[in-house]
């Protein structure tokens, strides 16, 4: 789905920047039908059960039902609110308790390093040839040995234009919004919130400059009294209901919110924003591996991937899915990055020292 055109979920060049940190490339051929690829040694499971652990409101209920109907496998879905919550859960359980989990790009690399993910060789599965070439050799999992691409997008913020005459354009505006917008919603996500604060004060992701780190902490301390909730769950619903008039949001959720309330506007901050990709992986202690692999293969069918993308309003890393996207997605201001905007940058993993800095700022902010 990566083409040099603005009719895609994200501008192709920016997606290439996100996933090409290890210099991948090449064109994209038409996706084959789901059953065209020889299965080799892979035998799909036709019964049993499995548990998917994913972000809140991030896997369509109708798609879960279709998976069970198509495969005979009962699917149970459980939810978390941040990559850090997922990591803590897997570390505490030694990778047990779930069959498929959905970490973001940098967290895939972290979990691989911690020996918490099972090697699956996604490209060798029957539908593995459907993985977009630009999504195959990614910096966090070269050759897709541990992960399958799910959806990708950006993190900015949204505000209600009916509540203020001011045009908000930056993270500085988000952290110090007009009084008439009231309380502010923010995510329960250390990487996103601290990263945005660092950008706002002229810093960068994984910054080690003591002055920038202190400035980010001071900014969040000043920001805290304006905060309504620190919760990634329910942001869309709170914005639509008017419980919050400004909140940090992912672009797909922002599109869904605007579809329900037309006065909501998504902002591409002038200081830059996170460009991320989420992925299906199998924890090392998964009990139902045949069912998990069947799920991964099923989700690499373009029709199933597109169904998720259309519901969630994000881009897909599966070839052929873009042809099945809803027309409104291809023209959405939340999905199509504005002409000339170059601030969307990939989230890369921080070192342990850098993570310690993030954690200290985050814990101070949460209080």
Regions picked out by a protein language model, each given a short descriptive name:
Residues 107-110, 245-263:
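A ligand-binding cleft/hinge motif common to bilobed small-molecule-binding domains
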Residues 25-26, 35-110:
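Early extracytoplasmic/lumenal segment of secretory-pathway proteins
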Residues 283-342:
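Mature extracytoplasmic/periplasmic domains
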Residues 54, 58-60, 85, 97-98, ...:
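Extracytoplasmic ligand-binding site segments that recognize negatively charged/polar headgroups
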